[in-house]
Amino acid sequence: SSAASDVYKRQKGMGTTVVAATISNQMMYFANVGDSRLYLINQGIQQLTKDHSLVEEMVRLGGIKPEEAKHHPDKNIITRAIGAKADVEVDFYEHRLKRGDIILMCTDGLSNMVEDEELFHIVQGGRDIVESGQALIEAAKENGGTDNIGVVLIEPFADEVSVL
């Protein structure tokens, strides 16, 4: 319709990032666009998604070191977003889960403000998944976070479900 076309023209260049996951039996299937991330936490922390950002490209091409990327002035420039163009390339992944795994999905409002090691210690130190989620948000705020802070924690083999 022409109304939808008008909205798209006015909002041209705007977009959002996304990370999504589904679990079937012991397999997790997940996807991302932009710099929203999925981490796997168990004995350590591992980022399973790749950021679609300018600094991530610079790291992949060897232009800067991963440590430099964390504080690079262009770290918020993303190279893919939903809605920025008529179509977008989505990265899809799969991972076999095991007992003790915890999945953390988050926006850059968390990952830009809290180092991976601190994320790990906060999640492992919580009494339960809800307390851990609240502590992650508080840590981002305490570190100066002003961006949207989106956090999802999943314990795939938990006996009960808790929602924050």
Question: Which residues make up each language-model segment?
Answer:
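Short, small-residue-biased leader/transition segments that mark boundaries at the very start
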Residues: 1-8
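Catalytic core regions of nucleotide second-messenger enzymes
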Residues: 9-14
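Conserved subregion of the PPM/PP2C metallophosphatase catalytic domain
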Residues: 16-106, 110-164
